[in-house]
From Swiss-Prot:
Listed GO CC annotations: cytoplasm
Natural source organism: Pseudomonas aeruginosa (strain ATCC 15692 / DSM 22644 / CIP 104116 / JCM 14847 / LMG 12228 / 1C / PRS 101 / PAO1)
PANTHER family: ENDORIBONUCLEASE YBEY, CHLOROPLASTIC
Protein name according to UniProt: Endoribonuclease YbeY
GO molecular function, one term: zinc ion binding
Family: Belongs to the endoribonuclease YbeY family.
Length: 160
């Protein structure tokens, strides 16, 4: 059974990726769990700010929030990984500020969020290195550049 993706568009931002692009990025990141279900919700800054404030106590809209599901796999037909909330205006602004191709930045954040749903994290240096290495490898498969190549420090709105 393939990936079950629920794409919710609650953003008026221009130049959003297609559902097919989101699906391809998720399938790449979730190769180890191809039979999975997740929701991606695209939001504007007001909703992104509200969610980041409520769940992370941060007073700004971040690029991606991940909400892993807490339902045992054996209770479901398809394992529910969780939800990703992506703030479209933040993604566009970051791509411009960081001089990254917009589609490459979208791909990176979707892959990054999916890896969080799989349990990867970047709280300590060793975990960050493992997660970032995997992100680089997956993005390279798509022909996208290393998203961390120009980073002097941790990106300011990277989501846990």
């Amino acid at each position: 059974m393939p990936l079950e993706l629920d794409l919710q568009v609650a953003s008026a931002a221009p130049d959003l990726p297609s559902e097919a692009q989101f699906r391809a990025w998720c399938e790449l990141a979730l190769r180890q769990r191809p039979e999975s279900e997740l929701t991606i919700r695209l939001v504007d800054e007001a909703e992104g700010l509200e969610l980041n404030s409520t769940y992370r106590h941060k007073d700004y809209a971040t690029n991606v929030l991940s909400f892993p599901a807490d339902v045992p796999d054996e209770l479901l037909d398809i394992p529910l990984l969780g939800d990703l909330v992506i703030c479209a205006p933040v993604v566009a602004r970051e791509a411009l500020e960081q001089r990254k191709p917009l589609q490459a930045h979208w791909a990176h954040l979707v892959i990054h969020g999916c890896l969080h749903l799989l349990g990867y994290d970047h709280i300590d240096d060793a975990e960050a290195e493992e997660m970032e290495t995997l992100e680089r490898e997956l993005l390279a498969e798509l022909g996208h550049p290393d998203p961390y190549a120009c980073d002097d420090e941790e990106p300011p709105s990277k989501e846990k």
